[in-house]
């Protein structure tokens, strides 16, 4: 199984504003993310990301995607097809397919990296700096070496970096 962390970030590493606003993320980035998720067929998100994502009109693009929400407490999903797990490892056990995309929040992203469960990372850098916001990784005690596999321009002012996590 290949586990891919896929996130859009500001130049200074934020994945959302402090109020969870992600309206600054471009359509081109969304299209790239959506294609990656649909190709993998599996998506793992945190409960806050799930609540944000399911309110987006574009969420209908994921109707055929197996989705797992990682939540520490009991959590109610919108459909029976969306599963709930209480840890990154439990989420992966529910999705034993070839490829899985993880798209946090910062706490979930950090947990997956800390537990050494990520194989590849796609980072789409948006041309914006946010003074306050939610970081790509919440505070955890880890260090991982990466190998750059590819970089490409996904829009006039946006680039995508693709890394392999060295294990």
Please provide the spans of the model-predicted regions.
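Enzymes that bind and transform nitrogen-containing heteroaromatic metabolites
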Residues: 1-167
């Amino acid at each position: 199984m290949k586990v891919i962390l896929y996130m859009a970030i500001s130049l200074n590493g934020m994945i959302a504003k402090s109020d969870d606003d992600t309206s600054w993320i471009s359509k081109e980035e969304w299209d790239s993310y959506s294609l990656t998720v649909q190709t993998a067929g599996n998506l793992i998100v945190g409960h806050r990301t799930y609540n944000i994502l399911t309110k987006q009109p574009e969420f209908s693009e994921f109707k055929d995607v197996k989705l797992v929400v990682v939540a520490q407490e009991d959590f109610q999903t919108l459909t029976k097809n969306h599963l709930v797990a209480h840890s990154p490892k439990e989420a992966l056990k529910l999705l034993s397919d070839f490829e899985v995309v993880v798209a946090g929040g910062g706490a979930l992203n950090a947990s997956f990296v800390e537990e050494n469960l990520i194989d590849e990372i796609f980072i789409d850098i948006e041309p914006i700096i946010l003074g306050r916001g939610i970081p790509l990784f919440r505070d955890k005690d880890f260090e991982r070496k990466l190998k750059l596999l590819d970089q490409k321009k996904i829009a006039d002012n946006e680039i995508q970096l693709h890394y392999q996590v060295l294990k």
